[in-house]
């Protein structure tokens, strides 16, 4: 609970347009999750009842409440680190890149996040750009950059052609 709705819903929408299998995950014991501004989403699965062995991507939306909860979830942090160490993809936007910084995932990488969180990107060079993609990690600055961030995820998973097709569908400039 406490996720940034624009970031979460934009990512969900764009990935589904690209026909990427996506599971919305509740970190709590109920499938209903409430965002920072009172918008409720229905999660597909509960984190505590799901195995992540076959997942290609961990995507962390921002939001002050959800990021605080994620910081305190040692099981999730272990799963994220294991996922990263296996060469699978990790994406974080807004406040949540700070979690990647804490885990050492951003070491010697360019990264971005909300400007107020730039000092939490341990080991990274903060760029302040809308998105940064390095190796198997993508970071996003914040809600206003959610479309670019989601298109970046599509490009990583499905390639530039699919990302361009989704961008054109949304009347985004492709270049």
Question: Which ranges hold each PLM region?
Answer:
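N-terminal beta1-alpha1 ligand-phosphate binding loop
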Residues: 1-10, 14
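N-terminal beta-loop-helix "entrance" segment that forms/cooperates
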Residues: 25-45
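Active-site-adjacent pocket-lining segments in enzyme domains
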Residues: 3, 17-26, 44-46, 50-175
